[in-house]
UniProtKB/Swiss-Prot annotation:
Quaternary structure (record): Homodimer.
Keywords: Amino-acid biosynthesis, ATP-binding, Kinase, Methionine biosynthesis, Nucleotide-binding, Transferase
Binding site for ATP: 40, 57, 111-113, 246-248
Name under which the protein is recorded: Methylthioribose kinase
Entry-linked InterPro entries: Aminoglycoside_PTrfase (IPR002575), Kinase-like_dom_sf (IPR011009), Methylthioribose_kinase (IPR009212)
Family to which the UniProt record says this protein belongs: Belongs to the methylthioribose kinase family.
Annotated organism of origin: Serratia proteamaculans (strain 568)
GO BP: any one term: L-methionine salvage from methylthioadenosine
Catalytic activity of the protein: 5-(methylsulfanyl)-D-ribose + ATP = 5-(methylsulfanyl)-alpha-D-ribose 1-phosphate + ADP + H(+)
Length: 399
């Protein structure tokens, strides 16, 4: 893009003055680069009192954690901004507000969420937000229903599928979720103590067959405009509040992928808790995670079905019973994608603090083995895990 340049802190301040929608833009005087992700520069823009007022986020033309040897499209910044704008239109309460974006500079200005915390960090600390799972379920139901065939016309949706074609970011997901963990790949990272389990997964014919189906559905089922990366590190929480951020992986894909990714991150925390806390606190935290899993699915399903019954525009899809039949397939997909998230976060490229921050090496490896075992069980048995209580029973059975 001819006008692209990488922002300095001073550039970010000036940009925020122009597009931050503040009554006194000259009050913005400094910027802190806070990006700890893999893909972007993120600046907190502060006023004269040191208070953060807005966020400026710019995509880099490469994967930050790898370097310029892994180039990456800047169009992801447009896709992220437009995904958040669409999601925010249907669920403003739980979507970060985009104040401005520029496709050529691959930059956007967002509301500041300094009064919120990253959900994963809070879960790892043992901080419980009892409303968060239900709020995330509401976000998923609203955004996924309103961008699906139930609500959009066929012509609208076909145009949107093209507009949100995101092949480079999707390939990252395709590789990291469904290919790398099951082969000997240089991107994989895992404790040598896990090598026996890793080799078992690579040689597990039933697992590989089920993963092939998950990948094929990811490639071919353009059901709704997904967030595409809705893990607990892409969600901000505060008391009674929740906001989804970081939607650069947005594309039209299988609804169960977003739901399964969200469930999988709750279960990654479930698997890690015995290594993060003593027995009593870990047991209590695990019960909270299971309650979160239950609420996330049940509230999502209830809200999605209610929207189907009230707002479906496509007459053929409004036939009694079809929405329920469709949702059952979403559930089966979600269970499988949940399992793939557990495995790829344990032995693939991108790990999570829920497991990696466990200080005792032996306990960490044991928690990681549990995550791998649960992930395999969910992927292979997804068609037989027909409802939420069966899922919870399978989780408890895994230990």
């Amino acid at each position: 893009m001819s006008h692209y340049r990488t922002f300095t802190a001073a550039d970010a301040v000036e940009y925020a003055r122009q597009y931050g929608q503040l009554a006194d833009p000259q009050a913005l005087v400094s910027a802190d680069e806070i990006g700890d992700g893999n893909l972007n520069l993120v600046f907190k823009i502060r006023d004269r009192d040191g208070v953060s007022r807005v966020i400026v986020k710019q995509a880099l033309p490469y994967v930050r954690c790898v370097g310029e040897s892994w180039p990456l499209t800047l169009d992801r910044a447009r896709i992220e901004a437009e995904t958040l704008l669409i999601h925010g239109g249907f669920c403003p309460r739980h979507t970060v507000k985009v104040l401005h974006h520029d496709a050529e500079l691959a930059v956007m200005v967002q509301e500041d969420l300094s009064d919120h915390h990253i959900w994963r960090s809070e879960l790892v600390k043992g901080h419980y937000y009892p409303l968060a799972a239900g709020q995330l379920a509401e976000y998923l139901a609203q955004t996924l229903f309103h961008t699906s065939d139930f609500y959009q016309t066929a012509q609208e949706k076909k145009a949107e599928v093209s507009r949100f074609s995101n092949p480079e970011l999707c390939q990252i997901t395709e590789d990291l979720f469904f290919t790398d963990p099951y082969i000997d790949h240089e991107r994989n990272q895992f404790d040598p103590a896990l090598l026996p389990q890793v080799l078992e997964l690579r040689n597990d014919a039933a697992l590989r067959l089920a993963v092939a189906g998950l990948k094929h559905r990811f490639l071919s089922k353009a059901e709704a405009l997904l967030h595409g990366d809705i893990h607990s590190g892409s969600v901000f929480v505060a008391e009674g509040k929740l906001k989804a951020i970081d939607a650069e992986f947005g594309f039209y894909g299988p609804i169960g992928f977003d739901v399964g990714t969200a469930l999988g991150n709750l279960l990654l925390n479930y698997c890690g808790l015995p290594g993060l806390f003593g027995p009593r606190d870990a047991a209590a935290g695990r019960e909270q995670r299971l309650q979160d899993v239950r609420e996330l699915w049940l509230i999502f399903a209830d809200r999605f079905l209610a929207l189907c019954h009230q707002q479906t525009r496509e007459a053929a899809l409004a036939v009694p019973g079809y929405a329920e039949q469709f949702l059952q397939q979403v559930w089966t997909d979600a269970v499988g994608y949940c399992g793939s998230e557990l495995i790829r976060r344990t032995i693939g490229l991108a790990h999570v603090a829920d497991l990696d921050s466990i200080s005792d090496a032996e306990m960490r490896a044991e928690c990681q083995r549990n995550a791998l075992g649960l992930g395999r069980a969910l992927i292979v048995n997804a068609p037989q895990i027909e409802h939420i209580d069966a899922l919870l029973a399978r989780i408890r059975q895994n230990g």
